[in-house]
Amino acid sequence: ACIDGFMGYDYNSAFSPEVTVSQKSYTPLFYDSDYLFYGNNYIDEQSRDFSQTDIQSWSEYLGKALPKEKIKYYLYDKEALKEIHQSAPSDKKVQRFFSLLAIARDNEAITNVSYNRWDYDSRKVAYTQQAEISKAETLYQDALKDKDEFFAHRMWYQLMRLKFYSAERASVIDYFMQTEAAQPRTDLYYRGMHYVAGAYIAQKNYAKSNPLLAQIFNKVPSLRQTVTYEYRPLSAEQLHKLSAGLSPQEQCALWAMDGYYNSEKDAIEKILALDSQSPYVDFLLSRYVNRLEAKVNIYGSYGEPISSYKAYHQHTLAVATQDYPTDWILTTAKDKKVANPYLWQVAAGYVSSFRNEFNEARTFLSKAEKMADNPAKKAQVRLISLLNEVAALERITPQAEQKLLKDLPWLWEYKAPEGQEALRSGYALVFIGKSLSMLYKAENNPIMAELTYSVKGYYRKEEQTAAMEQFLQKKDKTPWETFWAKKYQYTLNDIYESKAIYAFYEDQITEAIALMKKTPQEKAILPANPFNGKIRDCADCEHALPKKVKYTKLSFLEKVKEMEDKIAKGDDPYNNALLVGNAFYNASYFGSVRFFYLNPIIDEYGYRVSAEHWDILLNMKQAKKYYLLAKEH
């Protein structure tokens, strides 16, 4: 696995657009720092699937003349084409249905082709023929004469598609201009308009394509991701000119797509000036807040430590007032009648907390809680409220502990109910731990600092280790202490084993044996003979060798003790010292039994060694001591 891989949206986020923004059509447009669309969401056939609405529309048109299952079969089944051409139905509407299908399905190899996006060589481009377009035009004109509005509209759409995929793609533009006034404003109309936008895009005439895409964005939610992808950003001056011929809602859509690529803030302000009730600001606001928090929330699992209350607040204030101004969010939340007031109240509460305006944050979040109309929205408010309370703490007191204890167990145990959008809670868990740990360090309380957020090296100090052992075993813990002791990631067994390992590297073997006997890990078998010392230094080779003697962590320590006792008595000091030297070498990072130091507290499982353990895992002090002793004999 790559260490720079995807770590989840909650790695540095607590603001969930999945919860705060209601409409699903905006989901691909949520903020994603790694991909153009949220979740690397491809624009695939499914996102452009109108099959259900098409089947329903034809069913309503054909009535009892053709069952819905048959309609579906003729529209989409590969085996139906031959039957379509051979059928001679008596019903006029069914005849027209088959006539349309004969043209539409005969040309699917051109108009509905799928291809391998990685295959640049074998893709062939074919064009629809004029004869097919003429047949479709005849059917369209016949339907107009008969005043069959449904069929005429369907044939009009087929003509738009055939012209777009012809060698004269631009012909679809003129045809649309000549015929669009007579078309009802259905989804099919906007799907036809989409071909016109595509023709303009092919000409790189974005001043013409963008307004059309805005109309489609406004009317066909399922195409919002597609048209946003096809949109090309232009200057503000150009956009103002283009928007003149659009309705206020369409102008809002134009600015929404532009805000996706440029400034969400500017786009939101333009949209609100046109229509304060426009829903298009929702996904833009969520993107702005997600961008802001990504710069604020740098204290995740692999992020920065929180050095002090003051430093944290200086950082958040700078981001929320300079890098990402937020006055406009607060003003809008207070004064504007927006489409999604819940979203604005949550956003205002969240950014107020970053501005160190904690009481204002409480006010906004209290309003949001009253507006929350489902459990997920209520949980979102509760999460951000908890973050606000933690960020507001200048010092930790029993009163603060009691207040936080109302919500912390809920957050640690939180699981979204089935069918409910999940909160982004991962960062919150880490941030709360780091914040409380920082405050406890300031109070000179190393035990609670370690319990709330563990750091490597804590157990290198004997007095801290002893204090933690005593704390974990005490019976009269407060409810606050009990909560953190249960959540603490290490057990007494982990502590005993880590102490045994640390004692070994200090050559305190008797103590190491006594400690190892307290832990179940005493029986863990080492992957190689730790006393081998071959010129060919190959750990994998050592692991593959048959083992005449299988050493556990405990029996390994006991054997080292036996050899050291022999050295002290002068019993074969050369061989015993050489073997003990091998033991210390093989138990280092470079040796064949690195397994010996695997322990949750020491936490050195990878190919790197953290600085806290360089002195024992990379240091040859003990090995060198015994090799030199062997050399003397």
Region spans (language model):
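Extracytoplasmic/secretory-pathway proteins
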Residues: 1-144, 149-161, 166-633
